Amino acid sequence: PILDGGPCTIGIESTIVDLTQEQPAILRPGFIGQHDIESIVGPLGTSNTVAPGTLRSHYSPMTSLLLSHEPELERQKLETEGRSVAVLRAQETPQYARNLYAELRKMDEMGVDILIVEPAPNEGIGPAINDRLQRAAAKFSTD
């Protein structure tokens, strides 16, 4: 059985920080950002440790997902090619984080050929949102 706790207040998973080394490192970005962590522990280092939710392809919908800073231009181009498209525009970052997975699931259920998603601004919780979006798009990426 699956329990439905209703909508969540934050949306994306927590920040994971490695405190086992001399210099702490973020293993997975989340709601608590780098600036907030550095204000407590000082400058952060890097780590090669694998944490939950950090595989290259993760959080992926079934439908191809394209990240674009120009989603309307991409939509027009793809629709001209005869492709059916759904677009998710960036929102205020707390709202975007809170609704991200629900929006991706809803768009996935639409049965379109491609989901075009606009990345979040790269500030506050934006890097964590973009981390999840890059992972969601990774299995469809050619790089």
Name these PLM-found stretches.
Residues 1-143:
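Active-site-adjacent structural elements in enzyme catalytic cores
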